[in-house]
């Protein structure tokens, strides 16, 4: 049996009827996480900021993290894996899914590369568009707005600044304003992952 986990952006790009047809046609079983990884990751950031000093960069977007590292080494990178990676680790370790292939779809190539480098047992990461191409299925247009827009950290009781898009990130981290923030939310794609190279 082959299990398929669909990231939230891609899930918005396919109707329930089309998904059901795709799963049946290709003998795939959709799987979801049992844990609420978004809430768990948010709690990890809260705990980090409660116990550490200085300014941290949100580490959910590896492309943005790479950019910040190259431009402003004084900004600390949170040692917290992206939500998608947390989900994949759960699926790779779950006894009820043991010894079966798990396909984890991603909204971008860099997240797929990050996941595959972990070499999780029976688990393969692939951008949504490449997954569909590999099984000969057409891709619907990406949504106009991200299901995970900037603002993930808005309820944390710390100074949080949100930046999306390379120009905005570059401008912010090469200035001095970042020193006033405790956490910088970073999304390399403007306004969210719906602009990722894995869903376009």
For every predicted segment, state its role.
Residues 1-200:
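Iron-sulfur-associated redox domains of electron-transfer enzymes in respiratory
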């Amino acid at each position: 049996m082959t299990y398929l986990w669909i990231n939230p952006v891609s899930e918005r790009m396919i109707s329930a009827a089309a998904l059901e047809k795709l799963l049946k046609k290709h003998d795939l079983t959709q799987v979801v996480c049992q844990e609420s990884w978004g809430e768990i990751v948010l709690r990890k950031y809260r705990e980090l900021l409660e116990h550490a000093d200085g300014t941290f960069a949100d580490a959910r977007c590896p492309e943005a993290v790479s950019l910040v590292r190259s431009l402003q080494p004084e900004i600390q990178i949170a040692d917290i894996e992206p939500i998608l990676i947390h989900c994949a680790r759960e699926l790779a370790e779950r006894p009820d899914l043991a010894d079966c292939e798990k396909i984890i779809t991603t909204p971008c190539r860099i997240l797929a590369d990050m996941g595959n480098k972990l070499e999780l047992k029976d688990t393969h990461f692939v951008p949504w568009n490449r997954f569909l191409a590999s099984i000969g299925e057409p891709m619907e247009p990406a949504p106009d707005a991200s299901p995970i827009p900037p603002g993930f950290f808005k309820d944390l009781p710390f100074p949080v600044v949100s930046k999306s898009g390379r120009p905005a990130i570059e401008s912010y981290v090469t200035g001095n304003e970042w020193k006033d923030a405790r956490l910088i939310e970073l999304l390399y794609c403007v306004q969210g992952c719906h602009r990722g190279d894995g869903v376009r």
